[in-house]
Amino acid sequence: MEIDWQIGPASEWRADALIFFGLEEATEPLPGFKRWLDQHGQWLSASPVLRDFQGKYQEVAVCYGPPEANIPRVVMAGLGTREKFDMERLQGSAAAALNRCRELRLARPAFCLRSFYGLPLMVDSALKEALIGGLTGLHRYEELKTRDIAPSAAPSRLVVLNEYETTPELRALPGAAAAAAAGIILARDLVSSPANRATPAFLADCARRLADRDGCRIEVIGLEKAESMGMGGFAAVARGSRQPACMIVLERFPEADRRESPIVFVGKGITFDTGGISLKPRDHLEEMKQDMAGAAAVLGAFETLGRLGSDRHVVGIMPCTENMPGGNAYKPGDVIRTMSGLTVEVISTDAEGRMVLCDALTYAMRYKPAAVFDIATLTAAVIIALGQRVAAVMANRDILAEAVVDIGAQVGERLWPLPLYDLYFDYLKSDVADFKNVGDRTAGSIVGGMFLKQFVPDTTPWAHLDIAGTAWTDKDLGTTPRGGTGFGVRTLTELALQWPDLGIR
């Protein structure tokens, strides 16, 4: 969908529908809507639809005016009460409004910049989040359907209206919103893709397309080379599958000043997780195609950074394989030597994510990174702890965990810090190796983070994002239909963009 500005007197604005927002229990309309109503919407004042509109969250009302009018419809989108207003509600309301426009087959709906006046959010931020919510809320993963497909009725163009010329920064916001939405949509589609399609090779092809478009350096390390490099953890998991495994390495601006150490993102890319020999139960097993959501988030962040033309030096490392049972699969009781030289006793082959990530983290140190962020659907325990709308973050610096939480909040991705006290390592102690890959059921998410911590030097800022709960949704969330959510794309993107200003060493 294209997004255009239209600058000029409100009497000259043209659109199939003009979208305004309303708060529940408000004594009067938001100031931007009130002004437009007084000056140009007299026909709307007497509308029973407007009088019945209550402003409840995601309530949508369509008011019809004279067919010959420049703007023959007004779409009212409810935000709920002011006390509960947040960025996510604005995104959801914008998505609800644009989905109603889709149902009405409107080709050219519009947001008015003044419609965001009076909200507890800066106007530029409100515009950007409404656009992102609308764009992502309209998208559906239907690429593989062949029957009962309705012709796409999504708007082809979205217009932003304003009476006066805006600043260059404000002018650029629709492009930034489209870039963010594109990254989220890419990640969602990869996660929602079936595992017989979204194989490790498929993810590698996606990475190559990004590299070709943006001039990134790319290396795809196959299993044989990974074994020769000593990646015992990655290889142990990969040997159980017939699908060729690979470690994907993407680097933005490899010719950047080498005095600028890169930010490294490490994303878990288990394209299907049966649990291996420690076989998972059958319930919801089909959803284990989502176990590559960490890698998808990294690719989504690269998609956004590329569209933004960012000059940040960023590396993405994605260990991609299936975790399957079979004659070559690794087994409980095996001892694996990792790329770091540390040995791991395998207690559960269903804790495969940390086995592939540990080698990716060791490989990341070759870049002498300014910081490392790994993102993974690592533990079911995090769902028990935080549910499906909040992810966990663990870090080797408290200030870094706080920064991740804060940046996530800025973009509507909720994260919560969990501790990594040294005492948690006791759960990993082994009689036959340096440590085990799991403990008992106690503190499962934290113990997973503690395992990964062993592979990052204390001198390197590192954070682990456990997105096992947030990577997938079983219900339509307004901006996110059932399936992959794209969680983490915006947090990773902002970490890359804001890192120089965070002052963390």
From Swiss-Prot:
Task: Please indicate if the UniProt record lists Manganese as a keyword.
Answer: yes
The superkingdom of the source organism is Bacteria
Q: Which reaction does it catalyse?
A: Release of an N-terminal amino acid, Xaa-|-Yaa-, in which Xaa is preferably Leu, but may be other amino acids including Pro although not Arg or Lys, and Yaa may be Pro. Amino acid amides and methyl esters are also readily hydrolyzed, but rates on arylamides are exceedingly low; Release of an N-terminal amino acid, preferentially leucine, but not glutamic or aspartic acids
Where does the record place the catalytic residues? Answer: 280, 354
Which Gene Ontology BP annotations are present? proteolysis
Query: Has UniProt tagged this entry with the keyword Cytoplasm?
Result: yes
Cellular component terms, GO, for this chain's entry?
cytoplasm
Q: Which UniProt keywords apply?
A: Aminopeptidase, Cytoplasm, Hydrolase, Manganese, Metal-binding, Protease
Cofactor requirements of the protein: Mn(2+)
Where on this chain does Mn(2+) 2 bind?
268, 273, 291, 352
Q: Record-annotated residues binding Mn(2+) 1?
A: 273, 350, 352
How is the co-factor bound, per the entry?
Binds 2 manganese ions per subunit.
Q: What is this protein called?
A: Probable cytosol aminopeptidase
Originating species: Syntrophobacter fumaroxidans (strain DSM 10017 / MPOB)
